[in-house]
Amino acid sequence: MSFIPPQNFGMVECDLYRSGAPTELNFPFLEKLQLRKIIYLAPDECSEMFLNWLAEQQIELIQLGDDAGHRSPWKPVSEDVVVQGLHLLLDPQNYPLLVMCNLGRHRTGTMIGCLRKLQGWNLTSILEEYRRHAGSKFRLLNEQFIELFDCDLVPTSGRWRAP
């Protein structure tokens, strides 16, 4: 048996991971993470195979995708979706947790970038992490969204509080 991570997989924090949408080849790898929940940041339906695997593994899927009929794929994820997602990320009851979108680049990168901003990371480091996962496909609108995100929309405490 081989253990192949999903595209753009990365560890964000202990028991918090990010990636693109997994395929059947990635299931053995993901099983090793013993995930409790997956946040899916896309409006698209998940494959029946993936949904069946989630049920078998007793992993809760939380879909926070914007309505595809009303948003351009080039626009950043909405502020409401980011705030909802960050509330889930800040709750240790949801861990181990995977944040994913189709390719693990833009929506996931924006969500993790806003988390890093809450943690007090400097903007250069946040954008470097975003670009590492987005590669040459990075989007300036997403970077601007992260830069201008209002951290006061998400109350934090403990390990998530910026110094």
Describe each region flagged by the PLM.
Residues M1-V99, L103, T110-P163:
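Cys-dependent protein tyrosine phosphatase-like superfamily
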